[in-house]
């Protein structure tokens, strides 16, 4: 006997230890959902992009090699050639085949703020991607709510069916005694037993549904869900400012502002150093190369100021496009807030409706219980038949089921309102 008590206590402790709250399931589901990996990938991609942009300040080095054949080249006038020949000088002139192996180097000194703007755009794009991921991940909570409260409702229905089975079993035992005493017909006993077996069959179906839902919720959350805890009633305020979608819209608007600033950098001139060096023929000293066709080392160093006036052609249209894009984002935010407000109104009214209905549930159940007990007494005295008792048992169970549905639905609407407002 002592061992049985210890075993029972351990089972009860295990059951308590395995109880999960709605918040625990939501947190576990967010950690388990594959999309959460995108946070690290977005941060990594953004950092690499910024580093690549920053390398725009490094010297840009280009190595090249070329060989050309020209239809004509610079040559001495015939009079000059004859004069040199008379002096004993052989002026060969340039050859039509020319070769060059060289390196070009460019170093930006002032870029008009282009690199800084690109860096700001890359970081803001990363923030937009993170906000989008957060908004997508937030929807996990609603899916958890749906499965969690469906599971709670199934638990209540199974519990109520167990109560009905107990009532029917009690009536079945009483009728068995009455059949033996000759005060009840065997058909009455069979009727109650058939009803009990029917309820047991319904319970098995409900348990099968519960097992399936538990499995789905467990896989979704990444933890074993065996004993969901009924959450307490809460009151949520009417506000949508905390929703991650709002942060997404704000980051998208911020991105258009950064992009607009980047447009202005395209209108500014750039200043840079450059150097060219090559080994080939002909070199920079063309007169010497016309006399002796030898390869030589050559180099140029300078400073360059450039201004792309072509950016002026599209500047106005580019700004107009960004303005239209901002208006689209603002409109999407307005639509979201409108729909969010409609959901809040619906959920708030549903909570009020279920709360009002629950106020009458206790009285209805009390009345149905009294009627059922009276029916049991009447059956024992032969005043009513078994069908009347079964009807009252089902009526009482229906009243209790309605109360459970009203309570679970009210809690579901309360926590859906919390989801709508992100509280």
Task: Give the positions of each predicted feature.
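Periplasmic alpha-helical coiled-coil/stalk elements that build and connect Gram-negative outer-membrane
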Residues: 24, 48, 133-247, 254, ...
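Amphipathic alpha-helical coiled-coil segments and their boundaries
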Residues: 25, 32, 39, 108, ...
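Sec/SRP-type N-terminal targeting helices
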Residues: 37-41, 54, 109-137, 187, ...
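Small/polar, glycine/serine/threonine/aspartate-rich low-complexity segments that form flexible
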Residues: 64-104, 276-309
